[in-house]
């Protein structure tokens, strides 16, 4: 499962993992898991967290090592990219419902999520996803971006 992650994703997960592995012993506690997941843009419920922990905490000691964490994140990412969830996410960003995400709409949603981005950062995000170069993101471009993350 974890072998389907890109090197960039693995590096991101390692960075997040080590931020919460306070004593550097290579494991994180179950309490810290929710914080790690949220830092990576996931938003699991308490029940989902408990399920994930139970699935990967093989020895039942309440801690998760990095290989277990990678497996869990790979599973979680695969699950969250269903077409219906991507469509819902697109609708959240496409405030006026015109089928496009503008820089203003992107900035609005990111600000509501607590991400304070500069205009340059927002423009860069649009540029990265904007395949046809029209300055906004349509549904196909959004799907492509979501599937490649």
Curated annotation (Swiss-Prot):
Residues 8-43, 44-79, 81-116, 117-149 form the EF-hand domain. The modification N-acetylalanine is found at residue 2. Ca(2+) 3 binds at residues 94, 96, 98, 105. Keywords: Acetylation, Calcium, Metal-binding, Methylation, Repeat. It comes from the Eukaryota. The modification N6,N6,N6-trimethyllysine is found at residue 116. Pfam families: EF-hand_7 (PF13499). One of its GO terms (cellular component) is myosin II complex. Transmembrane segments: none annotated. Ca(2+) 4 binds at residues 130, 132, 134, 136, 141. Ca(2+) 1 binds at residues 21, 23, 25, 27, 32. GO terms for molecular function: calcium ion binding. Ca(2+) 2 binds at residues 57, 59, 61, 63, 68. CDD domains: EFh. The keyword Transcription does not apply. Belongs to the calmodulin family. This protein has four functional calcium-binding sites. Calmodulin mediates the control of a large number of enzymes, ion channels and other proteins by Ca(2+). Among the enzymes to be stimulated by the calmodulin-Ca(2+) complex are a number of protein kinases and phosphatases. This is Calmodulin.
